[in-house]
Amino acid sequence: MWRLKIAEGGNDPYLYSTNNYVGRQIWEFDPDAGTPEERAKAEEARQNFYKNRYQVKPSGDLLWRLQFLREKNFKQTIPQVRIEEGEEITREKATTALRRAVQFFSALQASDGHWPAENAGPLFFLPPLVMCMCITGHLDTVFPAEHRKEILRYIYYHQNEDGGWGLHIEGHSTMFCTALNYICMRILGEGPNGGQDDACTRARKWIHDHGSVTNIPSWGKTWLSILGVYDWSGCNPMPPEFWMLPSFLPMHPAKMWCYCRMVYMPMSYLYGKRFVGLITPLIQQLREELFTQPYDQINWKKNCHQCAPEDLYYPHPFIQDLIWDCLYISMEPLLTRWPLNMIIRKKALELTMKHIHYEDGSSRYITIGCVEKVLCMLACWVEDPNGDYFKKHLARIPDYIWVAEDGMKMQSFGSQQWDTGFAIQALLATNLTDEIGGVLRRGHDFIKKSQVQDNPSGDFKSMYRHISKGSWTFSDQDHGWQVSDCTAEGLKCCLLFSMMPPEIVGEHMEPERLYDSVNVLLSLQSKNGGLSAWEPAGAQDWLELLNPTEFFADIVIEHEYVERTSSAIHALVLFKKLYPGHRKKEIEDFIAKSVRFLESIQTSDGTWYGNWGVCFTYGTWFALGGLAAAGKTYNSCLAMRKAVDFLLRIQKDDGGWGESYLSCPEKKYVPLEANHSNLVHTAWAMMALVHAGQMDRDPTPLHRAAKLMINSQLEDGDFPQQEITGVFNRNCMLHYAAYRNIYPLWALAEYCRRVPLPS
């Protein structure tokens, strides 16, 4: 039986931590664990997911929840409530529903104070890891039989009805993910016609019907070339000499968005080496299975720019293809031949590996994310198959693995701090401190222990890194990468706790550490007033024309975001109130500029585009919260009035809100089909309206939404899993499994706290 283990490092000599592994969450299979009843419940969860896989595609994240609730002997003791047709919501019923949600959610807290949760959904995360383990000869040790069983389950359960796999679990089929998942099945032992529900046969038919893997986008071409199923001569150049460019050039690596930089760093190393794994009989078979013409007759150069229409979100402009062609024809032939291959290429490869080793060490070999993790790990193995660098990478693979009722998947890198920051704020909003003091104390302890204590090591600016001391990451302290809104939410939590008795919530954070957090936030504001995410923005916008991917947008440079900006306003307004003498003028200017930024990027229909959640509902909740925190009101702020008008206009007949993920790629509001509501979207809209004072004008829309929320609550106090709610890079969705608890709970708390209700 699978079990989730918290804050454990084990005895691996290649594993190390900055805070004794606080926040670490790893899965282990214990063949002797669990009673027959417990195993039956897990199997029932799997079968229920499979039956409903085309209706609800994100997992309910049930396996660890069943484990935690069992270990804590949880039993919902508060009776369920329901609001009947025409019935008025009373304070008693609303508070009862809220207390039920709090009691259930509190039982899901881990021993170190965080709330575990799946953070996955893209279907290109896991296959490269399987391919990497196959190439390096570690497949059997990293993925023994039970792991393989769960990986295959995940692949089967998320195969679309047409036989393909989408970029993410709710997406239409794409060549990229269909090819990767087909290869993954074959590596894990399925035959050409094997797999549940004829998975391999259906997938191969989809691939052939859509032109074969010659139409796979550039990332796919890279991975297939590494595996030996494609040829490097069919890829656009990724010269490692890029890392040798002088810093005054506009396309210097330091000016790139950190994720883009960290993907193409190891990719350029592998490209520069033209590394290809061992050509085994399986690879020979894949060469026959994935193409519609003989492998040795393919014109690779002709396919460099080919991309299946299903994968194409960002068509490359002509100037970009021209640059690739010039590098392909004129530069690469010179750099791969003597003497330049020994003078320039060799030096470029060494410099690239220097950067890779620095980034690996700075993150305790977690690296910035799962795509980058696998590429950096493979680069370390190519450099030295028996070296310590690769062994340290192997030790951190469990940090990325997640298991749920839909199988085993690879996480983005974990959302421990992000989820916990919002969970704490939701719980604090309930005014139930007397009932949940221990929960709050543990959460406070986790947040304090998760703050990053130092900047990256050495001359970090020469390695293109920004300050991180005082920040919070998205996941845990070991990860090490500062994120502006994670920092703002962490700071806000610590400030809220500082206003509470330490005998209830534990020792308050020292002011100097709060000052460090403020320093990080102030450093990330751009001239336009907006806040970037990881590093200061400021590179020229035209560089986005060089976006080398086909299925993402806005990935080349850092940008400013409504969510990051609003989070920072919230935190700094509260900080200014509690520490009025610290950098007062800078903070006041920061807030004023941030407000102007929010007002300037509002869309014509009154919304804000959400960059990290679905979508206009999410962005508008953040924006209205930021404006309200800065002192704006419905009467004084036109932007608020326009936003409220929009939210009221799109409220559904059942009282809720529901937005399709298609809003994100299409950049226009798209409702869910069939007038369907989503409870997370409903919670965001409710809180947005509360920020704008809707209860003082007409509370009816809030009452209607609260009725839906209360009546949707499950018997144990949980809420049902619905559509996916997270997004990144415009076009790829991310499943935040904790959202279905955090936000309905928070919305009910704000409703009970801010909306007048009869006794």
UniProtKB/Swiss-Prot annotation:
InterPro entries: SQ_cyclase_C, SQ_cyclase_N, Squalene_cyclase, Terpenoid_cyclase/PrenylTrfase
Catalytic residues in the record: D485 (proton donor)
SUPFAM superfamilies reported for this sequence: Terpenoid cyclases/Protein prenyltransferases
An example Gene Ontology molecular-function term: beta-amyrin synthase activity
Class of enzymatic activity (EC top level): isomerase
Record's keyword terms, sorted: Isomerase, Repeat
Known pathway: Terpene metabolism
GO biological-process terms attached to the record: triterpenoid biosynthetic process
Name of the protein in question: Germanicol synthase
Organism: Rhizophora stylosa (Bakau)
